[in-house]
Amino acid sequence: MGAAVNTRPVRNHIDFATLVAVITLMLLSLGVVYSASSTIAFKKFADSEEMLMSHLLRVGLGLLAMFVAIRFDYHRFRTLSKPALVGAIGLLALTLVVGVVAKGAMRWISLGPLKIQPSEFAKYALLFHLCTLISTKGEMIRDFKRGFVPMMVWIGIVTGLVVLQPNFSMASIIVLLSMVMLFIGGVRMKHLALTAAPVVPGMVGILLLEPYRVIRIREYGEAVLGRFNAGSIPYQLRQGLIAFGRGGIFGVGPGESRQRDFFLPEAHTDFVYSIIGEEYGFVGTMFFMLLFLLIMYRGYKIARYAPDAFGRNLAIAITSVITLYALVNAGVTLGLLPTTGLPMPFVSFGGSSMIFTAAAVGVLLNISSQTDLHPRATQVPVVGSVNAGKAAVGKVY
């Protein structure tokens, strides 16, 4: 007979290190985005500060979302995750009908002066609901029909709608993170392998449908095989690497970037890390990356000592999203990965990513406020994990 579980939140202090790291990234992004966007902002709006003001508003909304989420008990997402996911799916479908077309993709919905990217919300809604199912179903998660299939249906719906936008990079990230969460949650490996058999070839087929994706993969393959030369390096990557080269160890100084002046496309979004390297040098890029590594370390520590399986899974999911995005963005700008279009969390210009990721950090900090990160006694096993019991609580889909 199991002991009674006290689900009443125990309030400790939030994890200060994570909070400081995130706010530091947000504040530093103001100077970086201003420098990276000033030239293009002047060309488009005749005002070099236009995009800075927009970014400042988004940082403010992100901070507001984070502090609201800090006060919101994460256990409530057990009941809210499914309605949120259904709403996110509705927004994804709506995007395909009334979405704003930009650069050949329909990924945004216009709300007056604001544009939101529903896939950013859907990504977190899906992961949160998977965490709910994993912690609620218990041992049933290992059953193919009753546990595994319902979760794959949710993943398939979200991924399919994102692919139709089209946004292959986001769809790939959603699939990868979902599979990681299912693996951590205790899904049978043979079920994951059975799913991967058709999914991987299918994703490869979708990847090869667009010629520009084939070109990216070929160029990346040439780099891996050592056949890169100055003439074959893609223009955007070449300009990004020039920015790193100009920056050297200590950089050319804040606001002194030359690559932002119509040389480097997407300098304020996908390739903002190159501008950091140019203006602040190797030292600056390492400082930014250390902040992300600090968030990763503290996030996984929060997960380790979370008071229950749901909190543990949420912390793992949120931390994994931020870590993966930061590493992929940096890897792309350094030529280590094919171009993906994924932003650098808390730094790149972009409202939906900033607001939803900041809100997710607020959830992470709420978990930390109910977690003892410095246990002085033997840790009690997490209640609600796959190995904690055989019975599942109700039928949740």
Walk through the language-model features, giving the residues of each.
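Interfacial segments of multi-pass membrane proteins
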Residues: 172-191, 258-284, 342-357
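Transmembrane alpha-helix boundary/anchor motif
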Residues: 64, 72, 129, 204, ...
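Membrane-proximal intracellular helices of multi-pass ion channels
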Residues: 211, 286-289, 296-299, 303-311, ...
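Hydrophobic, glycine- and aromatic-enriched re-entrant/interface helices and adjoining loop segments
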Residues: 102, 106-108, 191-287, 306-314
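Hydrophobic alpha-helical transmembrane segments
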Residues: 57-62, 279-299
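Hydrophobic alpha-helical segments of polytopic membrane proteins
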Residues: 82-83, 87-89, 145-163, 168-208, ...
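Loop-to-helix entry and N-terminal half of a specific, functionally important transmembrane alpha helix
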Residues: 300-341, 347
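Membrane-helix boundary/helix-loop-helix interface segments in multi-pass membrane proteins
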Residues: 2-25, 31-166, 330-345, 349, ...
